[in-house]
Regions:
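PRPP-associated nucleotide enzymes
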Residues: 2-202
Length: 202
């Protein structure tokens, strides 16, 4: 039995499964949560907490129907929050791996780099990698390679938002817009919350 599971897959109560089905929409290929539409323009798409919650539930359900991960790994930093939420919904252990194009908030490279060791717990296990967005797929490919090299038995990928040509194994919404996540919209400056300057041209 995978560590962190309550029992064999499918052993959750019928009520719990029905509740999850009711609260998500499975009518579209990308499992878009009900009542929400991705902005088709290439502007900014502000993600509210209710959308993030529904999207996470829908994405977790999509994963569970096709894959049974034993461990969820979020790509730090932006993939940690969706990764932890997906892990909680799936009732699986959660770890993270640091991959970035930046160092101390300053761009230092054109391609992402693995900045920390892969979690040792991936050895011999089925793993789901989670990130918030993917466009070129460079970060996800690096993460997959790092976990395979660390001994993972099988690795699949999931993102909340697919924003480019790369196709992860699972995604929530597909949009060409710049994603503004609810936890990234404001930052603390001199003790006050102010709009994140990287979105100041919105």
């Amino acid at each position: 039995m995978p560590k962190g599971a309550n029992g064999p897959r499918g052993s959750r109560s019928t009520a719990a499964r029905d509740t999850l089905r009711v609260r998500t929409s499975t009518t579209s290929q990308s499992f878009m949560p009900r009542r929400y539409k991705a902005d088709p323009s290439k502007g900014y798409f502000q993600v509210e907490w209710p959308l993030f919650g529904e999207l996470s539930r829908a994405l977790a359900l999509k994963v569970a129907r096709a894959y049974d991960p034993e461990l969820v790994v979020g790509i730090a930093t932006a993939g940690v929050i969706p990764g932890a939420v997906i892990a909680a919904i799936l009732d699986r252990d959660f770890r993270s791996i640091l991959i970035s194009r930046r160092n101390d908030d300053a761009p230092v490279r054109n391609t992402p780099t693995v900045l920390g060791a892969a979690p040792q717990e991936v050895g011999g296990r089925r793993v789901l990698i989670v990130d918030e967005t993917c466009e070129s797929g460079d970060t996800l490919r690096l993460a997959v390679a790092a976990l395979v090299n660390a001994g993972a038995k099988e690795v699949r990928t999931a993102v909340s938002f697919r924003t480019g040509p790369y196709e992860p194994d699972f995604h929530g919404l597909e949009t060409e817009s710049v994603i503004v996540l609810p936890w990234d919209r404001e930052i603390l400056v001199d003790g006050e919350l102010v709009p994140n300057p990287k979105y100041e041209d919105q």
